[in-house]
Amino acid sequence: MAAKDKFAQRKNAGAIGGMMRTRVKERTKKMSSKTRRNYIRACNAFDVWRKGQGLSNKAVAKAPSKCVKQWQDALTEAGYSPSTIHTYIAGVCCGLGISMAGMTRAGTSADKRKSLGKSARAEKALERPENAEVVRFQRMVGGRRAALQRLKGGDLVRDESGEWCIQFLRDKGGKDQLQRIAPENLTAVQSYFKDKGPDELIFPQPIDKNLDLHGLRAEHARAEYERYAAICSTPKGRATMRAQLWRRFKNPRLGCKAWLTAKAKGDRAGMRRAERAFANEMADGQYHLQRANRATAELRGRPVSYDRLALCCVSVFALSHWRNEVTVKHYLL
């Protein structure tokens, strides 16, 4: 910690949250506004957490590194991805004026790293007999690495529309999510949960780090698009899927975060904004790729337009994303 740092010299640091935000603003003048906002958001989150833990201003000032490590452990336990934790820790370390040394990532997020694609390691990993069950399951479900590793026997459930799903607790961002199972895959998926206790891990052994799970998740997303496009090819099918999407949108635990937050605050205008945005995602018509995405699709022989409603079904029910743009760019291209 810098010797001239006023914060470090104080025995009682006062309002740590405010001081952290002030320091971030001073030290990020040459950084992008997005980085500054992320750092300030991280400081706010840390301040809320430490108050909930009963950590006083003085306790944090006396042992800032120890407190940040405790918060890092709490974020990991909550299911945040390594890259998200890294961003949070960077902001708080900046705010507290301490080094990030010793606070390295606990691994690499499968969804943030570059896909291994057709590399030799990935091909060999797919062919290994010991990986066969994970690969087969991933092609039917399309989960994230950390979520698959935590999957338990009690995580095969039905959603608000009565459809069978895999429940991923504390998935990306610490959120609980449901991903639907295609009817033709239900029996095979159920076999993984047979004779498993509610708290027994489905995959107790560490999943091979060379397995391109993101690539398999993308393969699953493309298969699900074809399935939902067939369902949405009739007026009855479109009406059914829209009704189910709205039910998920308003689910008290798994629904749209923006809408649920606005509802909790009694913000009717915010609720309407979220509803309009979601209605636009599943509007009739085609989602046409533009510029770089279109060029990439043409290069890879992929479609350059998608049915918006079917695409929204993939985003929400197969990937738990909510945004068609993310689904197309990261999974369908």
Language-model segments: residues:
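Short, charged phosphate-coordinating catalytic segments
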Residues: 138-162, 319-330
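Short functional hotspots where side chains directly engage DNA or cofactors
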Residues: 164-169, 282-333
